[in-house]
C-alpha cells in the first residue's frame, strides 16, 4: 500500500529540486557562462562531457516487447498542464513518478544517481550567469516533434506564454520570476530573471518546464480537459485511450533523441499499457494471472505471505528488493489547519501522541515498517537526533517559540508505546495538552472550548488507508474524540484534495536530497489558499517562509544543510503531520520476461530503464 500511495502523490507533484551535487568533475569552475552539457546546483557533476549513458541503464538493452502495468484510480484527460484536469490526467504523459516523461520533455534531464544534476536533452548546450540571473539554452538541431516538425525556439517562447496565462500551479506562479525571455539565435533562447527568483529557479526552468508544440496547440482551448492524443517530443506516442480504464503508448521508431547519452538504455519497450483498477486487490490478482508484468508492492503482509502462488514457486515471478539512497518519503495523517478545530498547535500535538505505531506495525504490518520522524528521514538533512548548530540557531533566532526545546536540542522523537494498544503514558500526555487548550472531558466525550463535542472526519481513498485510519480512530476514541472515516472514490478524493475540502487525510510527500522551490508549494504562506497547491496542511508561518528562503539562498553545502535542518525543526514543532512509517527499501515483483539493470541509482529503481527478454 505505501509505495502505491506514495506513487499517487508523486504523480501529481512537481518533485522539488535544490541540490548538493556530488561527483568528481568540476562543472564550470573557470567560466560559468561557457556553454556546457550539464547543470548542477552546487559545483560538481558526476559524469564527464563524453559520457555515453547514465550508469544505471543498460545501453545494450533489447528494444522489443511490451510492458503492462496496473495503477489504482481513474482518468478523464490527457492534459496534465491545467488545473481542471490536474489530478485526473492519464499516467505517463509527463513528470510521472514511475514512468517519467514519455510524451513531453524538458530542456534538460535529471540524473537519478545525483541529488540534482541536469544533462542535455532538448537543449544540447546550456550557459548560465555566475549569479544565476540568466540562463541560456541552445536547442539540439535534431530535436523533433512526433509529427516530424522541428522543435524551435518559438516553441519554448510559446510554452512560457501559455503556461503563464493558462497553466496550473506551479507553472503559472513560477513564471512570474522571469523578467524576460528572448530569442538570442536561430536555436538559442535566454531566460532573464527578476528579484523574485533564486539560485534554484534556473534549474527548474531547465529540468521541470515542459516544452510544448506551438503548431499543435489551440491557445483558446488549452485550458480544457481533452482526450485527443497529444503531439510531443518524447520517445512514446499515445496509441489508444479508453477513459478511466486504459492508456496505451507505443514507442516512436523515429524518436529523435534515441542516441543521446541521456536517453541511451531507456525506452526499451515497443508498447507500454497502463491499466486502471478500482483497488489493489483486483490489481494484484491480475498480476498473479500474468495479465500485468510487474507489481509495485507496498504491503508487508502481502509481500511476506501472499506470494505463494505457483508462478513464484516455479521461478516465473521474481521478487526484487531495491535499496535507495534518498530520504524516506513522508507518509502521515495531515491536519487541515484551515479548520478551526486544528488551529491550536497543542491540539495537533496531542493527537499526534495518540497514534500507536508499535501496535500497528506488529499487528497490521508484520513488523516490517520503521517509524518516520523527520521530513528528511534517514538523510544528513534530518534534524532528528542532532542538536541545532550555530547557523541553525542564527536562522531561527528571529522566531522565538517556532521550535520546541526538545526539537531544538535533538532529543525529540515520536512516542514509543508498549505495543499493547492501551498504553496510558501517551494518552495522559495528550489529555494534559488538550486540557491546556481548553478542552473538557464529560460523559466519555472530549468537549472543545466552544462547548461542542470534538469530532472530525478522516478522508481516505482505499481499504488500506481505511485500515490504518481505523487503528488511529480506536486510540482517539479512548479520549472521547469522535472520528468518522469516509472513504471516497478517486474522482471525489482528487476534487476535495484540490479544494482543501477535508479535516484530515493520509498525505504523502516525496522526499529528496534536493529540497528547493517545491517547499513553497508544500509549506509557503502564499500557497495556503491556492487551490491545487500541495499545502495540504494549510501552513502559513513566517518562520517556515524564512527557512525556505534560506535553503534557496545557500551557496555552500554547510549553509544548505543547516537551512534544511532548521526547516525540518520548524515543521516538526508545528505538528502539521502525524508521521507514520516507511519501508527502508522498495519491493517490486515481476514476471521473468521483464529484466532490469544491475545498478540501482540513488533514487531507486527506474522503470524506463527496464526491458523485455522473451524472444
From Swiss-Prot:
Chief localisation class: periplasm
Gene Ontology cellular component list: ATP-binding cassette (ABC) transporter complex; outer membrane-bounded periplasmic space
Localization of this protein: Periplasm
Domain of life: Bacteria
A Pfam family recorded for this sequence: SBP_bac_5
Keywords, alphabetical: Periplasm, Signal, Transport
Gene Ontology MF annotations: peptide transmembrane transporter activity
InterPro entries: Peptide/Ni-bd, SBP_5, SBP_5_dom
Listed Gene3D superfamilies: Dipeptide-binding Protein, Domain 3, Periplasmic binding protein-like II
Signal peptide per UniProt: 1-29
BP term (GO), one: microcin transport
PANTHER family to which the protein is assigned, alphabetical: ABC TRANSPORTER PERIPLASMIC BINDING PROTEIN, PERIPLASMIC BINDING COMPONENT OF ABC TRANSPORTER
Sequence similarity: Belongs to the bacterial solute-binding protein 5 family.
Name under which the protein is recorded: Putative binding protein BAB2_0664
Native species: Brucella abortus (strain 2308)
